From Swiss-Prot:
This is Peptide methionine sulfoxide reductase MsrA. It catalyses: L-methionyl-[protein] + [thioredoxin]-disulfide + H2O = L-methionyl-(S)-S-oxide-[protein] + [thioredoxin]-dithiol; [thioredoxin]-disulfide + L-methionine + H2O = L-methionine (S)-S-oxide + [thioredoxin]-dithiol. The gene is msrA. Disulfide bonds: none annotated. SUPFAM superfamilies: Peptide methionine sulfoxide reductase (SSF55068). The keyword Calcium does not apply. Has an important function as a repair enzyme for proteins that have been inactivated by oxidation. Catalyzes the reversible oxidation-reduction of methionine sulfoxide in proteins to methionine. Its EC number is 1.8.4.11.
């Protein structure tokens, strides 16, 4: 019997670039962008209060896992800048992991510790780790944005030399 699809919710700056790169990962079966982690019900682009721009990811655990997705997440955005990615500044652009269960929380905390220990970023990770709450899907014009506008704005890029070292087992 095949494993069920699992869900991850991440925020790391403008959701266009995050979605464009993460949706291409092997094992990712669906993505959608939206708003979460804030105070406004039925959030929209024009009124999202303290929500972060985020991406909801569905993935096949037989083909990838939460840790692999997080390692890529930490490669494509700068988790050491608070409320900022590139030219995008503000609470909407914070780095956050919204965990769906205790296992995701543990993996998130372990991965952050490994990123900090690696020295791959100039500062300590400021990524928030919070339980997932309501996810308000963004308007249709924001879904798959860079697929429709390949030369559109992004501040997310794969860093080929960025590889998180394997965790030393103690």
């Amino acid at each position: 019997m095949a494993a069920q699809t699992q869900r991850a919710v991440l925020a790391g700056g403008c959701f266009w670039g995050m979605e464009d790169l993460i949706r291409r990962l092997p094992g990712v079966t669906a993505t959608r962008v939206g708003y979460t982690g804030g105070d406004v019900p039925n959030a929209t682009y024009r009124n999202h209060g303290t929500h972060a721009e985020a991406i909801e990811i569905l993935f096949d655990p037989a083909r990838t896992d939460f840790r692999a997705i997080l390692e890529f997440f930490f490669q494509i955005h700068d988790p050491s800048t608070k409320n900022r990615q590139g030219n995008d500044i503000g609470l909407s652009y914070r780095s956050a992991i919204y965990y769906v269960d205790d296992e995701q929380k543990r993996i998130a905390e372990d991965t952050i510790a490994d990123v900090d220990a690696s020295g791959l970023w100039p500062g300590k990770v400021v990524t928030e780790v919070e339980p997932v709450g309501p996810f308000w899907e963004a308007e249709p014009e924001h879904q798959d944005y860079l697929e429709r506008y390949p030369d559109g704005y992004t501040c997310h890029f794969p860093r080929p030399g960025w590889r998180l070292p394997a965790r030393a087992e103690g």
